[in-house]
């Protein structure tokens, strides 16, 4: 006799159902309207088809409005896109089509690659298929049957996928009407539930299975959302992001470029290097007093990287150099450092340390190199050579909480100086594969959980916090700091990571109050992370309209007539003496032409001088993005612009001095 199936509902109630009861049956037992709105079920958090028999556990009925339904909407849209393509271009082979962030894609094998002009045609056919409202149904096939059917259809890529599935394992085949595909599922009840809030975005080339030795396929990307409003908002953000693309701004503002001879490394132009150095100078000032700035070697012997563990698990991403030995020595293998931490441990170990000297805080604007795949490179955001605003704190167990809070205060203060208000701090806890005892992890996670509570309490609701279970590094738990930019995108930047691994590997120790050797806690800390990436984020956040204090070129003095050139030189000199970065434009061009030209390069302030201004010893100030003009005396302009161009930390320092 079959036992009933026990299901626990979100309200805590428990009900018994007969074996073979489907998710749809359960929904109908609650209400007809719920069954009509439902698109899937979740058993213990795992999404399943409505047609699946339920199994014992916690059940949730998933409706189309549920956030989890978005993955199903996108998955189903991918299948409908594949059907549309094969209806329009018979003989096209369908390969794989997963859901990705904000959308989906499918890879197709076609004699002539798709072009952007094909996308509206495919979209139109997709809408027709959705309107047919065909049910998604599932069959289970044997491996042999699947190979035979796909071979007859000429789907050689599907045959290869089936071959990769273990012997004896049954395969799921999903139908929508007569069209079918190999798929793990789940899917919604019918194509009609996808809705019409979708759009095909672009075509691209993609090698089969990501291997350049395999044939090139055509990948079609799409996006799909619950509602048209959500789709419109997403497309608006994409359009804004394109206008704000830091690579485009880098060209327009003459900041940097990349070229084939140095893939993934930045060629900084004069203005770009100026803004980069301004960022470094600001960060360096924020470290004064609390940190020792150090500098570790760029190139270190393989043996050090073997000790650190990088050689074992990161070697393929390291730039390696082999140096020929002489007659008595073998060749030596060196590597460019991908991280600063092993070098900082060597500095900490140089000389005996007492507990009275702790915490020791070592900081470095360290140039690191990592061999990223060429396809992953993306302007300043993903490079092979970059600068980390790295620091490592060596402290006692008892000092760890205070150090984490101190780091948190610094990170939040830096983000606020750059105008970022929406910050999320999350604690990543122990992963399955890790070093260190459970007792060590218990203690560290308990301390960091209390720190997280303190961060939330002190922020009075301004800072959101959360937990990322199992997302910690193998060597210790960590805090991740994510900031939101002007168009709502999230960027993970800062980290605070506790490390049990490296101090042990390198035998780092201090002498405690009992004259015993103790292993220090090592805390990795980064605020910007990659300085290059953070600069890219700033450029996109401000759309190139950088705050005056961090702008690469702060003022252009432009004259209306040659009669004002001498006065223009005096104005420029006064502004330079006040600490501003100034260029002059005395060309024989109309002033509106000059203003437009400098606006394209995102100069924040244009100081206009004509004959009248020279006579009155005044200036006319025009701001980037504004039609307004402000007239003021030269003395007022120098004082006002000088104050505005002062970095936030220097303003605070001046205010403290004035109060003292």
UniProtKB/Swiss-Prot annotation:
In this chain, Zn(2+) is annotated as bound at 341, 392, 524
Domain (TGS) spans: 1-64
Q: What is the annotated quaternary arrangement, including any partners?
A: Homodimer.
Q: Which family does it belong to?
A: Belongs to the class-II aminoacyl-tRNA synthetase family.
Q: What is its EC number?
A: 6.1.1.3
Tell me the Gene Ontology biological-process terms attached to this UniProt entry.
threonyl-tRNA aminoacylation
| Protein name as catalogued | Threonine--tRNA ligase
Compartments it resides in:
Cytoplasm
Q: Which reaction does it catalyse?
A: tRNA(Thr) + L-threonine + ATP = L-threonyl-tRNA(Thr) + AMP + diphosphate + H(+)
What HAMAP family does the database record attribute to this sequence?
Thr_tRNA_synth (MF_00184)
The cofactors named for this UniProt entry are:
Zn(2+)
Cofactor: binding comment: Binds 1 zinc ion per subunit.
* Entry GO CC: cytosol
Q: Which SMART domains match?
A: tRNA_SAD
Query: Which PANTHER family does the record cross-reference, listed alphabetically?
Result: THREONINE--TRNA LIGASE, CHLOROPLASTIC_MITOCHONDRIAL 2 (PTHR11451:SF44), THREONINE-TRNA LIGASE (PTHR11451)
Q: What class of enzyme is it?
A: ligase
| Single GO MF descriptor | threonine-tRNA ligase activity
Q: Which UniProt keywords apply?
A: Aminoacyl-tRNA synthetase, ATP-binding, Cytoplasm, Ligase, Metal-binding, Nucleotide-binding, Protein biosynthesis, RNA-binding, tRNA-binding, Zinc
**Which organism is the protein's source?**
Sinorhizobium medicae (strain WSM419)
Write down the InterPro entries for this protein, in alphabetical order: aa-tRNA-synt_IIb, aa-tRNA-synth_II, aa-tRNA-synth_II/BPL/LPL, Anticodon-bd, Anticodon-bd_dom_sf, Beta-grasp_dom_sf, TGS, TGS-like
Q: Where is this region: Catalytic?
A: 245-547
């Amino acid at each position: 006799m079959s036992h009933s199936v026990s299901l626990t509902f979100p309200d805590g109630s428990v009900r018994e159902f007969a074996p073979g009861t489907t998710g749809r049956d359960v929904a109908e037992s609650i209400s007809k309207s719920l069954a009509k709105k439902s698109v899937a079920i979740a058993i213990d958090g795992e999404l399943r088809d409505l047609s699946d028999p339920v199994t014992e556990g916690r059940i949730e009925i998933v409706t189309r409005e549920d956030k989890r339904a978005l993955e199903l909407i996108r998955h189903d849209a991918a299948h409908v896109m594949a059907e549309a393509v094969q209806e329009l271009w018979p003989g096209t082979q369908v390969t794989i089509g997963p859901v990705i962030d904000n959308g989906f894609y499918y890879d197709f094998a076609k004699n002539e690659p798709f072009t952007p002009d094909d996308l509206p045609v495919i979209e139109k056919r997709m809408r027709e298929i959705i309107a047919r409202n065909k049910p998604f149904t599932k069959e289970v096939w044997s491996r042999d049957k699947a190979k035979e059917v796909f071979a007859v259809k000429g789907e050689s890529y599907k045959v290869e996928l089936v071959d990769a599935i273990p012997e004896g394992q049954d395969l799921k085949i999903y139908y929508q009407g007569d069209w079918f595909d190999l798929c793990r599922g789940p899917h919604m009840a019918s194509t009609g539930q996808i809705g019409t809030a979708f759009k095909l975005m672009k075509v691209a080339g993609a090698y089969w299975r990501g291997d350049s030795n395999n044939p090139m396929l055509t990948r079609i990307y799409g996006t799909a959302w619950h509602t048209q409003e959500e789709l419109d908002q997403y497309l608006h953000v994409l359009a804004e992001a394109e206008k704000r693309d830091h690579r485009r701004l880098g060209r327009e503002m003459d900041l940097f470029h990349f070229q084939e001879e140095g893939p993934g490394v930045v060629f900084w132009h004069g203005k770009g290097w100026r803004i980069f150095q301004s960022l470094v100078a600001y960060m360096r000032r924020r470290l004064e007093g609390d940190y020792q700035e150090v500098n570790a070697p760029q190139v270190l012997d393989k043996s050090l990287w073997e000790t650190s563990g990088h050689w074992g698990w990161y070697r393929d991403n390291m730039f390696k150099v082999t140096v020929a030995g002489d007659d008595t020595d073998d060749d030596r293998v060196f590597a460019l450092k991908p991280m600063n931490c092993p070098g900082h441990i060597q500095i900490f170990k140089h000389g005996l340390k007492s507990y009275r000297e702790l915490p020791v805080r070592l900081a470095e604007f360290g140039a690191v190199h990592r061999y990223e795949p060429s396809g992953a490179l993306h302007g300043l955001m993903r490079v092979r050579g970059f600068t980390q605003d790295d620091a490592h704190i060596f402290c006692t167990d008892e000092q760890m909480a205070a150090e984490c809070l101190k780091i948190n205060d610094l990170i939040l203060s830096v983000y606020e100086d750059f105008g970022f208000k929406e910050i999320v701090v999350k604690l990543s806890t122990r992963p399955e594969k890790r070093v260190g005892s459970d007792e060590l992890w218990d203690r560290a996670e308990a301390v960091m959980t209390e720190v997280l509570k303190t961060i939330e309490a002190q922020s009075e609701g301004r800072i959101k916090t959360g937990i990322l279970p199992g997302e910690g590094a193998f060597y210790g738990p960590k805090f991740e700091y994510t900031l939101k930019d002007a168009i709502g995108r999230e960027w993970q930047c800062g980290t605070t990571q506790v490390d049990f691994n490296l101090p042990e590997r390198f035998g780092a120790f201090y002498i405690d109050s009992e004259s015993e050797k103790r292993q220090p806690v090592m805390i990795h800390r980064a605020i910007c992370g990659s300085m290059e990436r953070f600069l890219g984020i700033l450029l996109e956040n401000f759309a190139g309209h950088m705050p005056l204090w961090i702008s690469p070129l702060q003022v252009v003095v432009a004259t209306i007539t040659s009669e004002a050139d001498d006065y223009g030189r005096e104005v420029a000199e006064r502004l330079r003496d006040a600490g501003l970065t100034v260029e002059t434009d005395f060309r024989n061009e109309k002033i509106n032409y000059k203003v437009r030209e400098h606006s394209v390069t995102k100069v924040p302030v244009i100081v206009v001088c004509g004959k009248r201004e020279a006579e009155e010893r005044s200036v006319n100030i025009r701001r980037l993005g504004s039609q307004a003009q402000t007239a003021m005396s030269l003395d007022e302009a120098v004082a006002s612009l000088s104050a505005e161009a002062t970095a936030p930390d220097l303003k605070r320092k001046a205010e403290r001095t004035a109060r003292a």
